[in-house]
Amino acid sequence: MENNKEIIHESEVKELIIELRGEKVLIDRDVAKLYGVETKRINEAVKNNRDKFPNGYMFSLQVSEKQQLVENFDRFSSLKHSPVEPKAFTEKGLYMLATILRSPRATATTFAIIESFFKLSLIHIS
């Protein structure tokens, strides 16, 4: 996904969605990967727009949650000894993030994220 013009498919998003605290979320590093930016850019966007991310939009992982990620998902192994507290974005938080990140890649990624969460909600309802 290094090419900023690459189209993001719903299947790519779906396989990154995890459940924490009873909510389907994407972890900041996965969000960054989808948007084709560094994780620190996602976190800077949040920090610079804190008022757009109230409770329920995103949260920092507790140590035990971070440990759970490392143990259950190979893609998070680099977090094992990292002092960084990863952030989890809920569906609402991802929509808000989309209003901040502006680029053709961000627009395409947002469409894929919206479709993925919508389809997951349909599965949950059935």
Task: Please annotate each region the language model reported.
Residues 123-125:
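Conserved small/polar residues in nucleotide/adenosyl-binding loops
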